[in-house]
Amino acid sequence: MTRIAVQTRSSREQAVSDVALLERVAEGDVRALSELAARHCLSLRALAFGILRDAVEAEQIVQATFREVRYEAGRFDPAHFPVFGWLAEVTRVGALQRSRVRAGLPEILS
């Protein structure tokens, strides 16, 4: 069996980098937003897909998540949530809202 060495950052290093990226996003840095999206989009898409069971809708929810991140980044407080936790919560709420609409139920206002 062949083993492949994968170099990864520790969770703490990644979290610090995520906070730095989000600070840059708050300053209007589109590249930072792209890097943050590239880093987390697969996990967020899987989360949304787990709720919606539809790949296209899951992708739409992830795109909506990063649109919200673009406008709300300056309000994020890393003392309350890790960045990925916030991204996951925005994605989860968006997917649940979409699921409610699909089922003909009213949206829940946040």
Regions found by a protein language model. Give the residues of each.
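Intrinsic, short, N-terminal disordered tails of RNA polymerase sigma-factor systems
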Residues: M1-E27, R31, E35-A38, R67, ...
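Short connector loops in the HATPase_c
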Residues: R53-D54, R75-A79, G104
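Short, charged helix-capping/linker segments at alpha-helix termini
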Residues: R3, A26-S34, R45-A64
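Short, intrinsically disordered/low-complexity patches at protein termini
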Residues: A46, A55-A58, P82-G85, S99-V101
